[in-house]
Amino acid sequence: MLWDGVEYACKIDGKMDGELYTKILQDELQESLAFYGKDPSTITFQQDNDPKHKSKKATTWFEDHGFKILPWPAQSPDLNPIEHLWDHLKRKLGEYERAPVGILELWERVQVEWEKIEPEVCQNLIESMPRRVAAVVKAKGGHTKY
């Protein structure tokens, strides 16, 4: 997810670990940034503290490619704007009249709905970050409406 919209979706077969995450960064992220004309040195990359994100391999990859990483507080995945984008996508997929028949139809629907996400959805999620962080501080790290 970028300030000006979503990148293209990438399908993952199986369980993601640090190795697969780094491969996605190398292949999919690099290709996406090139497609959109983005320079990694001008990007602040945000991710939560999931073990695959903090793996030595992924950390080294980011350092080697000149990305700045936004520091992220422990135990706060719900602050991550992408979690709200996943929720948006799930709601859209739930609007279909019938369940998909098989994984291929599900993936086709995911791609269709992902590409329909307007840049304003991403902008609103990112712009909501100060409010969400303030709510967490006010709740002393406890639960918030977000």
Predicted segments — roles?
Residues M1, N49, G66, P71-P73:
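Residues that form ligand- and interface-recognition hot spots within folded domains
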Residues I43-T44, K57, D64, I69:
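Preference for well-ordered, secondary-structure-rich cores of eukaryotic proteins
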Residues L2-E7, D50-K52, S76:
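Short, solvent-exposed loop/turn segments at secondary-structure junctions
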Residues M1-P40:
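Electropositive, glycine- and tryptophan-enriched low-complexity nucleic-acid-binding patches
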Residues G14-G18, P51, Q75, L79, ...:
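Amphipathic alpha-helical protein-protein interaction segments
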Residues L33-I43, E118-N124:
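Surface-exposed helix-capping loop/turn segments at secondary-structure junctions
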